[in-house]
Amino acid sequence: MKLYNLKNHNEQVNFETAVKLGLGQKQGLFFPVKLPIMTPVELSKILKMDFITRSTEILSKFISSEISKEVLHEHVKKAFSFSKPLKICINKNISCFELFHGPTLAFKDFGARFMAQMILCLNKKNESFTILTATSGDTGAAVAHAFYGMKNIRVIILYPKGKITLLQEQLFCTLGKNIKTISINGSFDDCQKLVKKAFDDKKLKESIGLNSANSINISRLLAQICYYFEAFSLISEEKRKNLVIAVPCGNFGNLTAGLLAKSLGLPIQSFIACTNSNDTVPRFLNSGKWNPKKTVSTISNAMDISCPNNWPRIEELFRRKKWDLKELRFGSVSDNVTKETLKELFRMGYVSEPHAAIAYRLLHDQLKKEEFGLFLGTAHPSKFKDTVEKILENSISLPKELKNRNNLPLLSHNINPDFNKLKEFLLEK
């Protein structure tokens, strides 16, 4: 697999290098030189496979030149060892595709665990790596648990202090060992800026073997393609004809993966890019002007991102496929509407959480009579227990994954958004 840097098309690397580097020169994202396409016969065959076998087939379309299908299958099996997503019907035209049945109760488990397996597979020289990543909530836990206890790998996770839930914090800030966590006195965008500055420091990058586990890493992105095929396989042929998928968007990696699935030949009619009040992309799609505003805090904190990293990949995919960006549906939802939507879903017998509620709201409001809609459930409602209970005036129980960490002490350090302070921490052995 060859990939090129979106900021310098002359910089081309193979899959192994892209996984290990994370970003190219000038913080450029890597993007596939060739975009594979399935024939209708291939698609029909692949939809009948089980999740692990199908995922292996999909991923091998991209990386078979570097990793054999047999080896890949073993790593996919280890990465996706949790129960496959469940499809919950809300009504006859709308279902929730739940992606939160992994070890850290969020869709990020798919990408993080596959990336960990790829580094294991490709690190033949037993090199040491420092994984530096920023999280607005769920990425931190998924990455921490995926890499926990791995030899020669140190993980450092930045997150905005006071802007993720305590339950989210407890999932990854209580592990210790090779997992280090730093709360930043600022926003998630401040955390991302620090990560990018670290990658810009060539000497630092080389001295500590710096890598990133955010959705900027191509291995995470490819893994997420797989569950869109799973979603498609679970619905009837009649409903497949006019399928619309609403995606809660933060860094836009999830939507990028869905669009790559469509690029492969999965006949999804359209996607809805769903944001909260941090609506840089909806405003851009509406006006044609890219104008990020200061990030505001919302109850859907994992989407509190004003400068989404993956947007350049979406623009590149639309350019390469000659698709029209006007075909991408979009919308933003305020906290007040999110709260009312959570109550609406609860009255229908479904307990959700703020991110999925935003996707449901926009899907419900934009879905046409002849269409069938899926909205993605990206995190377990219990991760937002305090918020959800307050809105619904009803208690929700904690799953064992959260109960097990509920009373453990937080092991985080705290710094201001100062790159020199972060650099000192990174250089500590």
UniProtKB/Swiss-Prot annotation:
<dbReference type="GO" id="GO:0004795">
    <property type="term" value="F:threonine synthase activity"/>
</dbReference>
<feature type="modified residue" description="N6-(pyridoxal phosphate)lysine">
    <location>
        <position position="108"/>
    </location>
</feature>
<dbReference type="InterPro" id="IPR001926">
    <property type="entry name" value="TrpB-like_PALP"/>
</dbReference>
<dbReference type="InterPro" id="IPR051166">
    <property type="entry name" value="Threonine_Synthase"/>
</dbReference>
<dbReference type="InterPro" id="IPR000634">
    <property type="entry name" value="Ser/Thr_deHydtase_PyrdxlP-BS"/>
</dbReference>
<dbReference type="Pfam" id="PF14821">
    <property type="entry name" value="Thr_synth_N"/>
</dbReference>
<comment type="similarity">
    <text>Belongs to the threonine synthase family.</text>
</comment>
<protein>
    <recommendedName>
        <fullName>Threonine synthase</fullName>
        <ecNumber>4.2.3.1</ecNumber>
    </recommendedName>
</protein>
<comment type="function">
    <text>Catalyzes the gamma-elimination of phosphate from L-phosphohomoserine and the beta-addition of water to produce L-threonine.</text>
</comment>
<dbReference type="GO" id="GO:0009088">
    <property type="term" value="P:threonine biosynthetic process"/>
</dbReference>
<keyword id="KW-0028">Amino-acid biosynthesis</keyword>
<comment type="pathway">
    <text>Amino-acid biosynthesis; L-threonine biosynthesis; L-threonine from L-aspartate: step 5/5.</text>
</comment>
<dbReference type="InterPro" id="IPR037158">
    <property type="entry name" value="Thr_synth_N_sf"/>
</dbReference>
<keyword id="KW-0456">Lyase</keyword>
<dbReference type="Pfam" id="PF00291">
    <property type="entry name" value="PALP"/>
</dbReference>
<dbReference type="GO" id="GO:0030170">
    <property type="term" value="F:pyridoxal phosphate binding"/>
</dbReference>
<dbReference type="InterPro" id="IPR029144">
    <property type="entry name" value="Thr_synth_N"/>
</dbReference>
<dbReference type="InterPro" id="IPR004450">
    <property type="entry name" value="Thr_synthase-like"/>
</dbReference>
<keyword id="KW-0791">Threonine biosynthesis</keyword>
<keyword id="KW-0663">Pyridoxal phosphate</keyword>
<dbReference type="InterPro" id="IPR036052">
    <property type="entry name" value="TrpB-like_PALP_sf"/>
</dbReference>
